[in-house]
Amino acid sequence: MTRIIAGFAGSLSLAVPGYGTRPTSDRVREAIFSALEARAAIDGMRVLDLYSGSGALGLEAASRGAAHVTLVDRLAATSRDNATRVLKQAPKDAPPIVVTLGQPVQAFLVSARDSWDLVFMDPPYDFGLPEIEQNLEALASRLKPGAIVVLERSSRTPAQGWPAGISLERRKDYGDTALYWLAAG
């Protein structure tokens, strides 16, 4: 079962879509958020969660202090329901804004006008490198200076290049999961 790990909604269980998703494990999410908290990289930020599925990554960020979270997945019913449940736990004086959009990620990125401080990108493992590169190219101009992109892929995925405006900081493997920490600029 997927759950919010910490923050105002800590330990709240989240529903997981039943259409063949691969939710990010608690272990990997804990590693992501420990690294982000060490950088003081959550509080007050604008966060984008692409291929959000259950919305666990974006909603974890909301629970830990992100000001605005956008969840994007072509099938958004589960993330929308989870967002409603998480927001019921939010402090009444300063709740985060959570927007859930049900549309293909590439279509969203091409039409997006906002910019973000932190982006989670967890596409299906069977997505090819061309799709990922298209997403990153469309995203690059929407990143704020110093923005962080956390890309989750299979640890067996071949190496790839990065578009102009995005550079690899590091890669860390957790079993079958590889996290690519990317930086804007």
Language-model features: where?
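Class I S-adenosyl-L-methionine-dependent methyltransferase catalytic core
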Residues: 1-185
